């Protein structure tokens, strides 16, 4: 972790599953400060007490900033002294975004623009934006807004000065807040049917640890404007549900199909065909480089 030695890292949306995974990975390293930026004071207070109990000797490295990525001045207020940013703040529930698409625009699109604008103004060293495989050939409001988030990050990278901007694109992060596996576990423990939307639906899956690994890979190896994607395995929703039943004592015959929810795709895609054509294979990851060709190209090539 020497690259983070004595540095200040800010995590937007930092009270979520990703922020917790980063704290557990970094707190006992030589990092200087981890700044949690989010709008929910109750979650911040819960996190403060949790980490004071869990890591009493290093919990003072965590600093909490109440603010909203939707507000540019709020982002600016949190920036002084920040060296790096992991931008995780997002609306990510597909059905909710379908019903309230402008709320998704405000957080995922305008919020990203605000974070990047404030970061560039403050001379932050690097910003890693967390995206989703739903941004590849998007069909729902969440995916569309995350696709625009990626476009904003790429566009900002062209004029970002000393600030490196990269995106990471995820599949489904298992056991993250709002994901289906915690719901299934709760259903099994309560003796209720295990509900799934469509047995043949496929999803790319990764762990929270892998989510942090991907961001660190982008931080260390990504170039300005890159999109970094992990080569995640895929499986059907039926297979996932049966595995959870086996692990937590549920019965496969109790699985109940409830139908596809608003905005959901049958099959996700990690990369578009166009991205595949230019992607660089980096072992466990793909790197999709940005094109810095200017809009004002000559009309002839004499």
Residue ranges: model-predicted function:
Residues 38, 66, 106:
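Conserved residues in the N-terminal Rossmann fold of short-chain dehydrogenase/reductase
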Residues 141-222, 233, 237, 241-248:
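NAD(P)-dependent short-chain dehydrogenase/reductase
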Residues 63-84:
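Conserved Rossmann-fold cofactor-binding substructure of NAD(P)-dependent oxidoreductases
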Residues 12-25:
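N-terminal Rossmann NAD(P)H-binding glycine-rich loop of SDR-like oxidoreductase domains
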Residues 84-87, 91-151, 155:
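Conserved Rossmann-fold NAD(P)-dependent oxidoreductase catalytic core, especially the SDR/UDP-sugar
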Residues 221-291:
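Mid/C-terminal beta-alpha module of Rossmann-like enzyme folds, strongest
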Residues 31-43:
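Conserved glycine-rich Rossmann-like NAD(P)H-binding loop of the short-chain dehydrogenase/reductase
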Residues 293-299:
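Conserved small/polar residues in nucleotide/adenosyl-binding loops
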